[in-house]
Amino acid sequence: SILAHSLGFERAYILNDLVALGYALDVLPDYAVRQINGGTPLGSQSLVAGIATGFNVSMCHAGHVIEAELGHASLPSSVIGVLQDVLGKKGRSFNTVESLFSGRGLAALHFALGFAETDPAQITGSTTEEGTQTVVLFAQLLGLFCREMTFQYMPFGGLYLNGSVVRAITSSKLTANIIIAEAEK
């Protein structure tokens, strides 16, 4: 290919960032992974989920990575049920995985809770009651969704969450524990 030749390689591949992370799982140094719950060693099937400007997953097993565009899939009924319990009719505005689990989704959840429109970084960096309420609900919903994904994908090698939204949400031990508690119910 032109790319490979220009770089001086025999072959070159363009990979989605989540696919690249899936291939890197077996060689990531310990400092690059923050384990928030116990799991089995690598070697079993794993799932990498990226939550940032959008939502995507990659399934990883035995050196093979299969990417999937999950962001445009419908939210599971369990997540929709909680959204409607908390938000009433406003909960119906979240109909796809990415409409909730993304930076844009975090901001939309904050607004649906009746708080002022703002960007995701201000929400996750906030120490206000409004910011905390949004982040805690987002963490609960993410934990519930993680449980759904583990039933669907059976990632015995672990579920790896990645992306700017996940880093911001799990920077607090409280919200990391909320995700785990919901995922393990």
What positions do the PLM features span?
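Phosphate-binding/catalytic loop of phosphoryl-transfer enzymes
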Residues: 1-94
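ATP-binding/phosphotransfer module of carbohydrate and carboxylate kinases, centering on a glycine-rich
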Residues: 8, 84-185
